[in-house]
Amino acid sequence: MDCGRDYCVKDLSLADEGWKKIDWVSRFMPVLQHIRREFEEKKPFKGVRIAATLHLEMKTAFLLLTLKAGGAEVSAAASNPLSTQDDVVAALAKAGVKVYAIRGESKEQYYEFMHKALDIRPNIIIDDGADMISLVHKERQELLDEIWGGSEETTTGVIRLRAMERDGVLRFSVIAVNDSYMKYLFDNRYGTGQSTWDGVMRATNLLIAGKNVVVVGYGWCGRGIAMRARGLGATVIVVEVDPIKALEARMDGFLVMNMKEAAKIGDIFITATGDIKCIRREHFELMKDGAIMANAGHFDVEIWKPDLEELAVEISNPRPNVTEYKLKDGRRLYLLADGRLVNLVAADGHPAEIMDMSFALQAKAAEYIKDNHGKLEPRVYILPREIDEMVARIKLASMGIEIEELTEEQKKYLESWEHGT
């Protein structure tokens, strides 16, 4: 472990490999490149301190470097103990980001490093799962007066923050970047859809075609996972608690059933709910020999490991990122990535082109907080639509796509109530 005054990483000598990764993905992130050039010129964050808790891999590194290019003092810690890429954080440390993260860090180190990232006394927090914002409210309340606001990347985090707002304990404004069109329509659906299966296939090296895939949760992440499973040739079964989403899944052409029925026939199970104990003892007891489980939600609580451990007579690791639970009756159940985010633990996370849009929103959310914090109340906000549209237009331009514009006549027609049948 290499630790200095402003960093704690596995090995600083890995930085060159980290730079190669960052350079590679930056070539496929034209929107964030555009914003970085803008930030380098205008320095909107001069004198501003930004602390981030994110999955510290190559795309998030480019976001942090973009904020630093805008004049910010930047610190960072991991939002998941297993998603850190050690070479990338070494590169960040060499670049002057105050970074504290080691792949495989303990729970104690996880929070110790988060505290270190908060020691810069941030004005803005960028969160992924709301752990840092929660920690500030619980244990670092002396920082609250200096915090202008924060932003949140994930569905899970937004749920937690809305609960804080509802309970009257949220002390500063937070931008729910996750709830922006350019986030959930693309990152949650196409990003999670592709990267989840990337993680499953890297971890197992097994065929998806012909298998029964059970997708637990049919939000935007679940939609993407189900869509890509069908594209890979699987029979897809959706498990839902929301009758509207369940009906939508059926109309989209997927089978829909409850978890107990799905447990009997599933070959691969993917959770994407943001909730606890979605697959538990009563379901493990029904699964066929060789069933594989993976989680695409933020926390490792959706597939309930304590029940698996109680049922198992033997636990082993036949492959990296695969845990085998042998049950009393001889059945073997497999859990990928220790029940954590399979796309980030067993693979490299979402494609760069997707995170280009999400992190462009994060960069602009930070700028929005800096410019408007005096007018914002301690509640959860959504980014203004014009920022969504700006990101979409830059992305389209980078793809060589020119869209139609409304004529003045069309605008007037849409604004009028007088024209009828």
Curated annotation (Swiss-Prot):
Please list the residues that bind NAD(+): 154-156, 188, 217-222, 240, 296-298, 343
Keyword NAD tagged: yes
Which InterPro entries does the entry mention?
A: Adenosylhomocyst_ase-like_sf (IPR042172), Adenosylhomocysteinase-like (IPR000043), Ado_hCys_hydrolase_NAD-bd (IPR015878), NAD(P)-bd_dom_sf (IPR036291), S-Ado-L-homoCys_hydrolase_CS (IPR020082)
Protein's recorded name: Adenosylhomocysteinase
- The main location class comes to cytoplasm
Q: Which domain of life is it from?
A: Archaea
Q: Its Enzyme Commission number?
A: 3.13.2.1
Pathway entry: Amino-acid biosynthesis; L-homocysteine biosynthesis; L-homocysteine from S-adenosyl-L-homocysteine: step 1/1
State the similarity comment. Belongs to the adenosylhomocysteinase family.
The Swiss-Prot or TrEMBL record annotates one GO molecular function as: adenosylhomocysteinase activity
Q: Which UniProt keywords apply?
A: Cytoplasm, Hydrolase, NAD, One-carbon metabolism
Per the UniProt record, the source organism is Pyrococcus horikoshii (strain ATCC 700860 / DSM 12428 / JCM 9974 / NBRC 100139 / OT-3)
Q: Name one GO cellular component term.
A: cytosol
Give the record's cofactor note, including how many are bound.
Answer: Binds 1 NAD(+) per subunit.
Query: Which reaction does this enzyme catalyse, per its entry?
Result: S-adenosyl-L-homocysteine + H2O = L-homocysteine + adenosine
Where substrate binds, per the record, is at D128, E153, K183, D187
Q: Where in the cell is it found?
A: Cytoplasm
SUPFAM superfamilies per the record? Formate/glycerate dehydrogenase catalytic domain-like, NAD(P)-binding Rossmann-fold domains
